[in-house]
């Protein structure tokens, strides 16, 4: 019973601190994309000669190309640079 009371008090203190900070257990918003879609079942060609872009398109028919050079379809990892179709 003592350990339950201690755990409850710790959670209560943590909650009060969160409320004082102002975020109060809010769910973080997904960041806005910083780049464009790598393609969506449409063949897209990079306008820049970048092997990472070509690999991203070859391995994935859709996804976001991140600044690290990896392609992802996870919306919360939209840290990418602009990819667009060549004329």
Swiss-Prot record:
Which GO CC annotations does the UniProt entry carry?
extracellular region
Alphabetic keyword roster: Antimicrobial, Disulfide bond, Fungicide, Plant defense, Secreted, Signal
Please state the span of the N-terminal signal peptide per the UniProt entry: 1-24
What residue ranges are annotated as transmembrane? Answer: none
Q: Where in the cell is it found?
A: Secreted
Biological process GO annotation list?
defense response to fungus; killing of cells of another organism
Protein origin, superkingdom: Eukaryota
> Where would you say this protein principally sits, based on its record?
secreted
* Disulfide bridge positions per record: 38-71, 47-80, 56-82
Q: Which family does it belong to?
A: Belongs to the DEFL family.
Q: What is this protein called?
A: Putative defensin-like protein 317
Per the UniProt entry, what species is this protein from, by scientific name?
A: Arabidopsis thaliana (Mouse-ear cress)
């Amino acid at each position: 019973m003592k350990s339950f009371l201690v755990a409850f008090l710790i959670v209560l203190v943590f909650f009060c601190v969160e409320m004082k900070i102002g975020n109060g257990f809010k769910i973080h918003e997904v960041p806005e994309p910083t780049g464009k879609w790598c393609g969506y079942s449409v063949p897209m060609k990079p306008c820049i000669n970048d092997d990472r872009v070509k690999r991203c398109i070859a391995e994935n028919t859709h996804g976001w190309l991140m600044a690290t050079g990896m392609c992802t379809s996870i919306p919360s990892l939209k840290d990418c640079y602009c990819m667009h179709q060549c004329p």
